Amino acid sequence: MEKDHLHNPDSLGDYGLETVKMIKDRFAKGVDRGILLMRHSAREYRRDIHDLQNPLTERGRDLALRMGDMLGADLKMRGFASTAQRCIDTADLIMRRTERDVRGERSKTRVTRVIEAFGVFYALDQVRMWKSLQAADGLDSFVAKWLKGEVAPDVMMPARVAVSQILSVMKGRLLTISSEKGRSHSLDLCVSHDMTLYLVRQAIGLETTFEQPVNYLDGLLMFETDGELRVSSHYGKEVCVDDFINT
C-alpha cells in the first residue's frame, strides 16, 4: 500500500467536522450502528471532461483522510459509493485511516463497493438534465422544482420515487450490519453527490435547499431508535422516515 499523503489538519477548513460530530454524538446516545449518506470530498471542476469524471483535488484527498482520522479506529466501517471515482476514492481514503485491528495494527484493506442507488440513477436523460440545471438559478432551485413536479418526467424520475429508492437501499445496508469483536460501533459510508443530499434532505422534512448548503463531506445519518427508522442532519433536525420507504 502506498504511504498516505501527509496533511496538515489545521489548514483544511471545517469540511466534515460537523458530520463527524453528529455521528459521535449519536453513538454516545446509545445507537450502535448507522448509515451515512454523504457528499464526496473536494473535487475538480474541469470543463474538458464529463462532470462525473472530475476527480478529487489533493485537498479533497487530505480532507477525506482527516475525516477518517477523526472517526477513529474503533469503528467497524464499510464503504459504498456512486460510480463516480471521486465518490469511491472518498470512501477508500476515509476507511484507510480506520483500518486497524484490535491490536492497533493495520488490517486488510477494505474495498468500496459501487451501488447505483448512490449515483445519478434518477436522471433519465442526462443531457437534458444538465441543460435544465444550467437554465435553473442554481442546483437548489433545480431540486426545488424537481420536488414540485416541475421537471419533465422523461428527464428526471419522480423525486419521491427516487427518495424512496435511496432510503430503501440505506435501510437494507442498516439491516445487514453485524458486530465485530473489538469495535463498539458500526458505520456504513454511502458516498454520493450534492444533488442526492439536497433531494433527500428536503423531501423527508429536514433543511430545504434554500436554508442550508450541502458542503463537501456533509452527510445524513440513518439509524434505528425506539422502533423507528430515523435520519438526522448535522444542522440539528431529525425525522422518522418509515413512511417514505415502500417496503
Which residue ranges define each predicted feature?
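Active-site-proximal alpha-helix that buttresses catalytic centers in soluble enzyme cores
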Residues: 1-112, 211-233
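Active-site or metal-binding loop neighborhoods of secreted/extracellular toxin and effector enzymes
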Residues: 155, 207, 224, 228-247
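Generic surface-pattern signal
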Residues: 25-29, 96, 148, 168-175, ...
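A broadly tuned preference for mixed-charge, low-complexity surface segments
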Residues: 82-97, 136-150, 234-247
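Active-site-adjacent alpha-helix immediately C-terminal to a catalytic or transition-state-stabilizing loop
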Residues: 164-231
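Phosphate-handling substructures
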Residues: 44-45, 50-55, 94-170
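Short low-complexity stretches enriched in small and charged residues
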Residues: 34-38, 136-146, 175-190
